[in-house]
Amino acid sequence: MILCSSKNLTLPKPEESFFSDLLVVGGGCSGLAAISAAADLGIENSLLLEKEESLGGRLGKCTEEISGLFAKTVQPKELLSHFSLFLENYEVPHRVGVEVEEIYFLSGEALSIAHAQDEASAYRYLLKAKTKEGSCFFIGKALILAVGALTPEENVAVSSLIEEEKKTGSPRLFPAGQSLAPSQSIAEAVQSGGAVGRTVGEMLLKEKHKQGF
């Protein structure tokens, strides 16, 4: 995964891209918690992207009971079933087998990519991804990174981008789980993802309220 400048971006046509209010990259415990929390607040136009062929991450591999989330301990696969049922009941879109290769922060002329969409300037991130069918593009107003521990290079790039975003007065990039703190346990990652999902969800709802939706 590479964070790139939009100066180097060859803009795809709007009809070649998928537009969402919220993009969550990573379908592990923190990503599932994040998009579930946002959906619970009423965010409907969201999309979860996972590079593996199934959701769950550590929840599908770990066998140790998880404590600290509920009154009693739960098995990882029980928690995964809980999230899967939530996504189904709330009809939360998600795609597997999607590997995000490049992330672009849209600014200046690059925002013209959303010229056919309402509120074009609200779209902040473009993701170039690889699937079995080929390359595709995802564009979102907010981006949650829940991809596990970042490499040192990725961590520096994300930190720099977050600092750059602060200048806009409206941050739209949010690391969660092990992307935020590599040593997080499953319970901590779920809590982190849920907190980030609520923060982003509340931000998007406030914006819609201001626009009269």
Language-model features and meaning:
Residues M1-F213:
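Residues forming the flavin
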